[in-house]
């Protein structure tokens, strides 16, 4: 993509991004927030949800942490496109997160308890939306050689 926002976000995710702590990376931030210390990531994917577009309810297999950064300059609730997190019954909605611009969502999708958590979906974008829903999404995961689960720092926030 030639979008400067996408280019800058890719730099932030893969390189140093702090002027105060030049060695503090996005990976360090996610590790600090989630408590997972041995995760890996790839470059984020750019998503474009046009009118009536949506994403089925799903889990993120072999992934431990997911993040979404919203790129919308403006977004109204009635336009849809919310990230919806399901309860353990995987039917009722536990939480709905608006895709407001400059919002970063980091969510645990790990399997440390033996059951998948945070099954989620994207609600349909309304035909009344002024523009598509734009976001960058990525995952922290573990390779097969890393062992059965990520290491969680019990002192994490």
Predicted features, each with a name:
Residues 47, 60-63, 72-74, 78-157:
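Catalytic core of Fe(II)/2-oxoglutarate
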Residues 34-45, 79:
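A short coil-to-beta-strand element that immediately follows conserved catalytic motifs
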Residues 21, 25, 41, 62, ...:
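Short, well-structured alpha-helical interface segments that form or flank functional binding sites
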Residues 1-33:
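Non-heme Fe(II)/2-oxoglutarate
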Residues 3, 39-43, 54, 105, ...:
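A structural signal for the main folded, soluble domain(s) of proteins
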Residues 32-38, 56-61, 75:
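Short, conserved, surface-exposed binding loops centered on an aromatic residue
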Residues 48-56:
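Beta-rich nucleic-acid/ligand-interaction surfaces
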């Amino acid at each position: 993509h030639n979008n400067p926002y996408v280019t800058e976000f890719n730099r932030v995710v893969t390189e140093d991004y702090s002027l105060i702590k030049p060695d503090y990376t996005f990976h360090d931030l996610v590790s600090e927030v989630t408590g997972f210390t041995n995760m890996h990531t790839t470059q984020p994917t750019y998503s474009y949800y046009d009118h009536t577009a949506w994403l089925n309810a799903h889990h993120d297999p072999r992934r431990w942490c997911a993040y979404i950064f919203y790129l919308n300059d403006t977004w109204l609730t009635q336009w849809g496109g919310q990230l919806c997190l399901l309860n353990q019954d995987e039917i009722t909605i536990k939480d709905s997160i608006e895709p407001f611009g400059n919002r970063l969502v980091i969510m645990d999708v790990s399997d440390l308890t033996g059951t998948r958590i945070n099954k989620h979906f994207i609600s349909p974008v309304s035909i009344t939306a002024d523009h598509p829903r734009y976001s960058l999404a990525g995952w922290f995961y573990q390779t097969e050689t890393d062992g059965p689960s990520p290491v969680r720092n019990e002192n994490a926030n």
